Regions:
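Alpha-helix initiation/capping motif
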Residues: 10-13, 27, 72, 100
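Acyl-donor (CoA/ACP) binding surface of acyl/acetyltransferases
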Residues: 1-5, 35-139
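Short, P/G- and charge-enriched loop/turn segments at secondary-structure junctions
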Residues: 23-26, 119-120
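Conserved GNAT-fold acetyl-CoA-binding loop/helix
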Residues: 3-23, 34-36
Length: 139
């Protein structure tokens, strides 16, 4: 399932999800969290999202989810690279952090293709993660 490598379980109801998305509003409004919709060029359907969290820091965090029927086509790589390139120029961070589930080989490849190296690890209730540091792509 698409939520297998998300850090949290999806809310069980629309009411529960309302609580979750409402907590996202303040960081979106103050510009510290940015979210980009990944759309198909042919028909503009939503393929996923890329998040840039702690965007105003020297090392913002990248995150991504791509719908299952669109995975395996390089869309995640293209989307993360596009956001990292834009942010490298527009926000001028030193680097990006990209936490990835240890078993999420496809997402690990995204980081590695962008010059990312493992700098740490994290544990959460669903899985263990490695944290990649991706350099500013404009330097």
């Amino acid at each position: 399932a698409i939520t297998r490598f998300m850090q949290w379980e999806p809310p069980r109801s629309l009411a529960a999800f309302a609580e979750v998305w409402q907590s996202w509003l303040a960081p979106i409004q103050d510009g510290s969290d940015l979210h980009f919709v990944v759309r198909a060029l042919a028909d503009a359907r939503c393929l996923g999202l890329v998040g840039l969290h702690a965007a105003k820091t020297v090392c913002p965090e990248l995150g991504i989810w791509i719908r299952e029927d669109a995975q395996g086509n390089g869309i995640g790589q293209e989307a993360i690279a596009a956001v990292a390139e834009w942010a490298s120029e527009a926000l001028e961070p030193n680097c990006f952090e990209y936490p990835v589930a240890e078993r999420n080989v496809a997402s690990r490849r995204i980081a590695e293709r962008l010059g990312g190296v493992i700098v740490g690890s994290r544990s959460n209730p669903k899985y263990n993660a490695v944290v990649y540091r991706i350099p500013n792509l404009r330097r």
